[in-house]
Design a protein with these regions (language model features):
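Conserved "right-hand" nucleotidyltransferase catalytic core of DNA-directed polymerases
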Residues: 213-347, 430-630, 637-643, 650-653, ...
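C-terminal polymerase-core module
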Residues: 506-513, 517-569, 736-788, 792, ...
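Extended two-metal-dependent nuclease catalytic cores across DNA- and RNA-processing enzymes
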Residues: 72-233
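Non-catalytic, usually N-terminal nucleic-acid engagement modules in DNA/RNA processing proteins
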Residues: 1-67
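Conserved catalytic core of nucleic-acid polymerases
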Residues: 435-438, 480-487, 542-544, 593-607, ...
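Short active-site loop/helix that positions an aromatic residue
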Residues: 14-23, 124-129, 333, 372-382, ...
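Short beta-strand
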Residues: 93, 116, 524-526, 818-823
Length: 876
């Protein structure tokens, strides 16, 4: 078997890799490293095929940095060091691509196989049975067969094909000749020279295009061809590959933040099941924890979350039988630290009572991943978890809110540690065949739990030093609030649900009859094809969006054209009823626990923006905008002697935006409690505020939220049912009135380009990827996100802090009022009737002062026996 020579087109790999790895990837020092990561990842992938005998990376001696993005330029300085850490020799030479080609040819001449790593399509012409090209951006290895399939010509004709078709700015190609035309010319005439010689016989569009470029084609061909005869800066024999020093490479990767590429050789986790209390004591000693029952000098305090976290911090992972923590059967718990060892205690083990004492010991510092669910499940097993100092899910969310969402442990471990956790589905099965944890051999259950605990520990220690400790502390306290909310839950009246279902069924039939009357004939409303035919072919309504097979009839698409015809609003309402009956009501019934309450799960780390998500059931799907939704809200009731109280921020988005922008056109009216939607409508319609109607105000509201969200004229036109020109005029008038809002959004986009992230009011970093994408749609989306993300994330900060401050203040005041739900800007509390006035005062005050904004926050307070029957009240 031949030796292999690895040839890396380093500058090319760096510049092109910048476009495919999100620019929010940063080193521990905050420096951009996305392009360097692309280089390292590509070489790691190639080395996984087969270790080379020789390895060389060619750097462009005098690279032309014109047009390089600002975040890319500083990464060039670190390229040589990175390559050398990978064991690759580095040479500098002008005309990088030709020197790469020459090294590849020299390797073949010396009897080696070769693999070229780069992103330039010209490397495809080098491919042979003994030479592969690896396109790092596509993660694709090209053999002669794959080159022929990709370019429709063999490797020997790729240069001619590229000369005609072109490839980015370096190879403009021939105008009017695409991939199919180039293949036709080359196959029909054997070569470009043959095509030019027979030019008089080539008719049609291809002939015209080739004739127009007759003088340019030879020059394009010269650009496309690689010269394999360039002098080699360093002889091939001097470029022997030696595997790098793993410790030094890991140290570099740790500094650069390349956790996925860290070497974990020898990191296999050894998991020991504990049968007795003595086994557990010995295991805890090996993990570096204090013995059970030995008091610490002080109770641990939640958390600083940095390298100075309390010594002996142990990560735990519980095996739960049901995904709903309040119903979860607890099978066992694994403990791990950074020692390469873990232990597992089954609930049936004699070691369990000793483990419970450790779990409830507030002086024993503990870590975990998504510990809200674990804490709730332990509570229902009679265990009060204490001493938690950190949650790796929070560290992941605060480090990379978007890239690693939804931040479940297998995904985060893959990204941060480069480690694949055991596949539970492969071990337990799926569906009805799924095995219970307690039916598995204990060593298999222990291995899964132990590796998960070890991963949680490793993720925490890798990420927590990169996150503001104050934010980690805030999220840690928030998790205590969420545990109490999950444990409390909300009472649901099943009889009210039954009555709602019957009423919805009757109304659904009535709506279907009205829809068919407007259509002029019966049809299957539930059929996208038939509905689309009625709306877009028969009624000629505007098409809001398309799918691969035609027009879209999704809810989002229909909401954009709701103004166009009365039938659309009826269809939307019919669909809502159908969904409520078929899924939501049944789901809600299934979620009612034995105590008559639904215990929704809360996830503070799953949304990019930071707003709280709830599931099982998702109570955010019960807004009170329609009579049907109000009917469902009526099923949520307070127990005897208590009421439900809602504290809701008033126009929170506008108050936060006023603070961020300091725009007088926002600040001054909000200080006077003016209706901002009326003022916006007056501005964009160029009319006095006194003349604004209810419909006009709705237009102002749509313009406000659409523009704050960074939408363009096309999207706004669809929402309002106006022409794109009219929408542009509305936006122009909006920008004229709120000039500092637009300036603020422009500045956020600039900062996102410069830093790779935005910063919210609470100091959270939200990385924005895709700003340098070659895909116009991806780039446009990233730009809109960058414009709105600071505002959107800051609104979530206020909502989260408001919930936390309200719960903290109520407990400090000794009140029995508890929060039970948060949906966006609203917090719902369960309140003893006797303390309603005081609870309203305490909660409202705390939420108003969650952040001190330019214009003080305003909250509304309502209370009543059900969620649907809330009426305004005044606090004490």
């Amino acid at each position: 078997m031949s030796d292999r020579t690895l040839v890396v087109s380093a500058s090319n790999l760096l510049s092109r890799g910048f476009l495919v790895v999100p620019t929010d990837r940063r080193s521990r020092d905050g420096e951009p490293v996305n392009a360097l990561f692309a280089v390292a990842r590509a070489i790691h992938r190639v080395l996984a095929f087969k270790l080379p005998a020789r390895a060389v990376a060619v750097l462009e001696a005098s690279p032309n940095l014109t047009g390089w993005p600002p975040l890319l330029v500083p990464q060039l300085a670190g390229l040589r060091g990175l390559l050398e850490a990978l064991g690759v020799h580095v040479v500098e030479a002008p005309d990088e691509v030709h020197v790469v080609a020459s090294y590849a040819r020299a390797a073949l001449a010396a009897g080696d196989d070769a693999i070229v790593v780069g992103v330039d399509k010209r490397y495809a012409q080098l491919v042979s049975e003994r030479l592969w090209w690896y396109d790092a951006n596509k993660d694709a290895r090209y053999t002669p067969e794959i080159v022929h399939k990709r370019f429709t010509v063999p490797p020997g004709k790729v240069a001619e094909w590229l000369a005609l078709v072109g490839d980015d700015d370096a190879l403009p190609g021939v105008k009017g000749i695409g991939a199919k035309g180039a293949t036709t010319l080359i196959e029909g005439h054997g070569s470009i020279a043959g095509a030019l010689a027979a030019l008089d016989t080539i008719t049609g569009r291809l002939g015209n295009a080739l004739r127009a470029a007759r003088d340019d084609v030879p020059r394009e061909l010269a650009r496309a061809r690689l010269d394999t005869e360039r002098p080699l800066p360093v002889a091939l024999t001097a470029l022997g590959y030696a595997p790098p020093d793993v410790a030094a490479q890991n140290a570099l990767y740790d500094r650069l933040g390349f956790a996925e590429l860290l070497s974990h050789d020898g990191d296999a986790i050894r998991v020991e099941p504990c049968a007795t209390a003595d086994d557990l004591a010995a295991a805890l000693a090996r993990l570096g924890a204090r013995p059970i029952g030995v008091a610490a000098s002080r109770e641990v305090e939640p958390p600083a979350g940095r390298e100075d976290s309390p010594a002996g911090s142990i990560a735990l992972h519980a095996l739960l039988e049901d995904p709903a923590p309040v119903r979860a059967a607890l099978t066992g718990i694994a403990l791990a630290a950074g020692t390469g060892e873990a232990c597992y205690v089954a609930r049936t083990s004699a070691a369990w009572p000793a483990l419970v004492r450790w779990l409830e010991d507030a002086s024993a510092p503990k870590l975990g991943h998504e510990l809200v669910a674990t804490t709730v499940a332990l509570h229902h097993a009679g265990i009060r978890l204490a001493g938690v100092i950190g949650d790796s899910a929070f560290a992941s969310h605060l480090s990379q809110p978007s890239n690693w969402a939804p931040h479940d442990l297998p995904l985060v471990a893959k990204h941060v540690l480069g480690r694949a956790l055991p596949d539970e589905d492969a071990v337990r099965g799926v569906g009805r065949a799924r095995k219970r944890w307690d039916t598995l051999p204990i060593d298999r259950a222990a291995a899964i739990a132990g590796q998960s605990a070890a991963a949680a520990s490793a993720v925490w220690h890798a990420l927590s030093p990169t996150v503001d400790p104050a934010l980690l502390a805030e999220y840690r306290e928030l998790s205590d609030t969420l545990v109490r909310m999950e444990l409390t839950g909300l009472i649901v009246d099943p009889d009210e649900l039954t009555g709602a279902e019957a009423a919805f069924a009757t109304l659904e039939v009535e709506l279907a009859q009205q829809i068919e009357a407007l259509a002029g004939h019966p049809f299957n409303i539930n059929s996208s094809k038939q509905l689309g035919s009625v709306l877009f072919e028969e009624l000629k309504l505007p098409i809001a969006s398309h799918t691969k097979t035609g027009w879209s009839t999704s809810i989002e698409a229909l909401e954009r054209i709701e103004h166009a015809h009365p039938i659309v609003a009826l269809v939307l309402r019919w669909r809502q009823l159908r969904r409520l009956r078929d899924s939501w009501l049944n789901t809600l019934r299934r979620c009612i626990d034995s105590d008559g309450r639904v215990h929704s799960r809360f996830h503070p780390a799953r949304s990019f923006s930071g707003h709280l998500i709830n599931t099982n059931p998702d109570l955010a799907r019960v807004p009170g905008r329609t009579p049907e939704m109000q009917r469902i809200r009526r099923a949520f009731v307070a127990p005897p002697g208590r009421v439900l109280m809602s504290v809701d921020y008033h126009q929170l988005g506008l108050y936060v935006l006023a603070h961020l922008t300091r725009d007088p056109a926002l600040v001054d009216p909000l200080r006077q409690r003016a209706d901002m939607h009326v003022l916006t409508a007056a501005a964009v319609l160029d009319r006095p505020a006194e003349s604004i109607t209810v419909d006009d105000r709705q237009l102002g509201k749509v313009v406000n939220f659409a523009t704050f969200a960074g939408q363009g004229a096309s999207a706004l036109a669809l929402q309002l049912g106006v022409s794109a020109q009219d929408a542009r005029q509305l936006i122009a008038r909006f920008d004229q009135r709120y000039a500092q809002v637009r300036a603020f959004q422009d500045e956020q986009l600039r900062l996102a380009r410069e830093r790779g992230y935005i910063v919210t009011l609470a100091g959270r970093r939200w990385p924005i990827g895709g700003l340098e994408s070659l895909d116009p749609q991806d780039r446009s989306y990233a730009e809109r996100l960058a414009r709105r993300a600071t505002h959107e994330g800051s609104v979530s900060d206020v909502s989260r802090r408001g919930l936390l401050e309200a719960d903290r203040a109520l407990r400090r005041a000794g009140l029995a009022t508890v929060p039970v739900l948060q949906i966006l800007d609203e917090v719902l509390f369960e309140v003893p009737e006797a303390e309603l006035a005081e609870a309203a005062r305490v909660a409202a005050t705390a939420m108003r002062h969650a952040f001190e904004l330019e214009v003080p926050l305003v909250v509304g307070i309502e209370a009543g026996p059900t969620w649907a029957d809330l009426v305004p009240i005044a606090p004490a």
